[in-house]
Amino acid sequence: MGTQGSPVKSYDYLLKFLLVGDSDVGKGEILESLQDGAAESPYAYSNGIDYKTTTILLDGRRVKLELWDTSGQGRFCTIFRSYSRGAQGILLVYDITNRWSFDGIDRWIKEIDEHAPGVPRILVGNRLHLAFKRQVPTEQARAYAEKNCMTFFEVSPLCNFNVIESFTELSRIVLMRHGMEKIWRPNRVFSLQDLCCRAIVSCTPVHLIDKLPLPVTIKSHLKSFSMANGMNAVMMHGRSYSLASGAGGSGSKGNSLKRSKSIRPPQSPPQNCSRSNCKIS
């Protein structure tokens, strides 16, 4: 007969994220692309609010995310002010095919600075699968994100591209901000999952992980593991650069793609050897 007790949690950390942006930028599409988790709000009154939970893997830890879409209509700004309390991360979403939605990000940043100051945020350009209708250049959005100290992603829920990666990166930023990263990193014993990830990532460039015959969730975890541990290479503008290489000129880019050769120290005969022919040829 089993004894009743507190239920075992299916996650290690619980984070609350808000998706904000103008209406019709596809925030609901992002939530709908997440296959796991519940879609029912834990609160009785949630008019104008879309809610979903999902669980991601971050360095072998399970992070449960509560995702709230506060809608983008002006009358919901007051709702945003209420739901921003306790938020630990914010995704600023715009539509890359709608210039007006990108220009509206300034207004949302002002709302965040007023009602949720200091909360980590990232900039997300949605509907990358409609790039042929693009109105917001990638470089302009990236420069805007850097100016406002934000990480930048372009995502496509339809193609399942960069959605999980954006949530994973924001989770990492939040946990590092709160010092959680230090809890599990020092003196940890590597799990079997960590060892398998380390073995795969050590011999596979990060831009080739998507081509491995593995489930999407595992490939996403492998990329997250690679970035977190500074292993292998990262992709920048379609080219692979070694994480160990410095920010040098164009000459260093070519060298960064070459494998470093192992250099062995020169061998010499033992000094106390009495044989006259003790030499290394």
From Swiss-Prot:
<feature type="binding site">
    <location>
        <position position="27"/>
    </location>
    <ligand>
        <name>GTP</name>
    </ligand>
</feature>
<feature type="binding site">
    <location>
        <position position="46"/>
    </location>
    <ligand>
        <name>GTP</name>
    </ligand>
</feature>
<keyword id="KW-0963">Cytoplasm</keyword>
<dbReference type="GO" id="GO:0016567">
    <property type="term" value="P:protein ubiquitination"/>
</dbReference>
<feature type="lipid moiety-binding region" description="S-geranylgeranyl cysteine">
    <location>
        <position position="278"/>
    </location>
</feature>
<keyword id="KW-0564">Palmitate</keyword>
<keyword id="KW-0378">Hydrolase</keyword>
<dbReference type="GO" id="GO:0003924">
    <property type="term" value="F:GTPase activity"/>
</dbReference>
<dbReference type="GO" id="GO:0005525">
    <property type="term" value="F:GTP binding"/>
</dbReference>
<keyword id="KW-1003">Cell membrane</keyword>
<dbReference type="InterPro" id="IPR050305">
    <property type="entry name" value="Small_GTPase_Rab"/>
</dbReference>
<feature type="domain" description="SOCS box">
    <location>
        <begin position="175"/>
        <end position="228"/>
    </location>
</feature>
<feature type="binding site">
    <location>
        <position position="69"/>
    </location>
    <ligand>
        <name>Mg(2+)</name>
    </ligand>
</feature>
<dbReference type="GO" id="GO:0005811">
    <property type="term" value="C:lipid droplet"/>
</dbReference>
<comment type="subunit">
    <text>Component of the cullin-5-RING E3 ubiquitin-protein ligase complex (ECS(RAB40C) complex) composed of CUL5, Elongin BC (ELOB and ELOC), RNF7/RBX2 and RAB40C. Interacts with protein phosphatase 6 (PP6) complex components ANKRD28, ANKRD52, PPP6C, PP6R1 and PP6R2; the interaction leads to ANKRD28 ubiquitination and decreased PP6 activity. Interacts with DAB2IP; DAB2IP acts as a GAP for RAB40C.</text>
</comment>
<dbReference type="GO" id="GO:0005886">
    <property type="term" value="C:plasma membrane"/>
</dbReference>
<comment type="similarity">
    <text>Belongs to the small GTPase superfamily. Rab family.</text>
</comment>
<dbReference type="GO" id="GO:0005794">
    <property type="term" value="C:Golgi apparatus"/>
</dbReference>
<feature type="binding site">
    <location>
        <position position="23"/>
    </location>
    <ligand>
        <name>GTP</name>
    </ligand>
</feature>
<keyword id="KW-0449">Lipoprotein</keyword>
<feature type="binding site">
    <location>
        <position position="72"/>
    </location>
    <ligand>
        <name>GTP</name>
    </ligand>
</feature>
<feature type="region of interest" description="Switch-I">
    <location>
        <begin position="41"/>
        <end position="49"/>
    </location>
</feature>
<keyword id="KW-0636">Prenylation</keyword>
<keyword id="KW-0333">Golgi apparatus</keyword>
<feature type="binding site">
    <location>
        <position position="126"/>
    </location>
    <ligand>
        <name>GTP</name>
    </ligand>
</feature>
<keyword id="KW-0833">Ubl conjugation pathway</keyword>
<dbReference type="InterPro" id="IPR001496">
    <property type="entry name" value="SOCS_box"/>
</dbReference>
<dbReference type="InterPro" id="IPR005225">
    <property type="entry name" value="Small_GTP-bd"/>
</dbReference>
<protein>
    <recommendedName>
        <fullName>Ras-related protein Rab-40C</fullName>
        <ecNumber>3.6.5.2</ecNumber>
    </recommendedName>
</protein>
<feature type="compositionally biased region" description="Polar residues">
    <location>
        <begin position="270"/>
        <end position="281"/>
    </location>
</feature>
<keyword id="KW-0460">Magnesium</keyword>
<dbReference type="Pfam" id="PF00071">
    <property type="entry name" value="Ras"/>
</dbReference>
<dbReference type="InterPro" id="IPR001806">
    <property type="entry name" value="Small_GTPase"/>
</dbReference>
<feature type="binding site">
    <location>
        <position position="127"/>
    </location>
    <ligand>
        <name>GTP</name>
    </ligand>
</feature>
<dbReference type="InterPro" id="IPR027417">
    <property type="entry name" value="P-loop_NTPase"/>
</dbReference>
<dbReference type="GO" id="GO:0035556">
    <property type="term" value="P:intracellular signal transduction"/>
</dbReference>
<keyword id="KW-0472">Membrane</keyword>
<keyword id="KW-0342">GTP-binding</keyword>
<dbReference type="InterPro" id="IPR036036">
    <property type="entry name" value="SOCS_box-like_dom_sf"/>
</dbReference>
<keyword id="KW-0547">Nucleotide-binding</keyword>
<feature type="lipid moiety-binding region" description="S-palmitoyl cysteine">
    <location>
        <position position="273"/>
    </location>
</feature>
<keyword id="KW-0479">Metal-binding</keyword>
